[in-house]
């Protein structure tokens, strides 16, 4: 099994240095993500899509960490979708299951990864999700409108997992049809494949804003000392 890490984004909403290269504890966020997957026995390969101008630097840094799971660092594309495409091409041939995980989502627990893996083995595609908890309303800049039902609404997380041939086909179709999507689930659903929802955790958040970064720094000591506390027992219902 392989995990693809699209890490070529610039982190404009957070500002400053791209979030995946900021230090969280003793290592950059990207390294913490890779360490999470290195601890999982089913994951044998990791491919990172880095900024094109930083491929050599990122390769040197990751190799210096002694990460046995690291297979390749490739140049990313102009957006997340193209970065996943580039990383997918570097996956070794024998691999038939592929996970895609955000480079700025460091608090993914082993039990959550395993749940996605099992769902992919059963049905072919799966993603971590968290039910929407907040009240939702339509509206514009001037006034609030009606409440939107939260029933059946989910916030998408990663990892998202797929049979390799499904994901490859989905990206080929997207390129042929000039289809853009914000995650790989949408591309696979475009092929009429079902994607299984797997309970995620609110702690498995993506670092996007300054508030997210502050929260990540606050949670880091707990994750460092006892990452099992972040497993499915700390899921969206908690």
From Swiss-Prot:
GO biological process: isopentenyl diphosphate biosynthetic process, methylerythritol 4-phosphate pathway
Site entry (Positions MEP for the nucleophilic attack), positions: 150, 206
Site keyed Transition state stabilizer: positions: 13, 19
Keyword Ribonucleoprotein: no
InterPro entries linked to this entry: IspD, IspD/TarI, IspD/TarI_cytidylyltransf_bact, ISPD_synthase_CS, Nucleotide-diphossugar_trans
GO molecular function term, any single one: 2-C-methyl-D-erythritol 4-phosphate cytidylyltransferase activity
Source species, domain of life: Bacteria
Keywords: Isoprene biosynthesis, Nucleotidyltransferase, Transferase
CDD domains listed in its UniProt record: CDP-ME_synthetase
Transmembrane segments: none
EC number(s) given by UniProt: 2.7.7.60
Pathway in which the depicted protein is active: Isoprenoid biosynthesis; isopentenyl diphosphate biosynthesis via DXP pathway; isopentenyl diphosphate from 1-deoxy-D-xylulose 5-phosphate: step 2/6
Catalyzed reaction equations: 2-C-methyl-D-erythritol 4-phosphate + CTP + H(+) = 4-CDP-2-C-methyl-D-erythritol + diphosphate
Record function comment: Catalyzes the formation of 4-diphosphocytidyl-2-C-methyl-D-erythritol from CTP and 2-C-methyl-D-erythritol 4-phosphate (MEP).
Protein family: Belongs to the IspD/TarI cytidylyltransferase family. IspD subfamily.
Protein name in UniProt: 2-C-methyl-D-erythritol 4-phosphate cytidylyltransferase
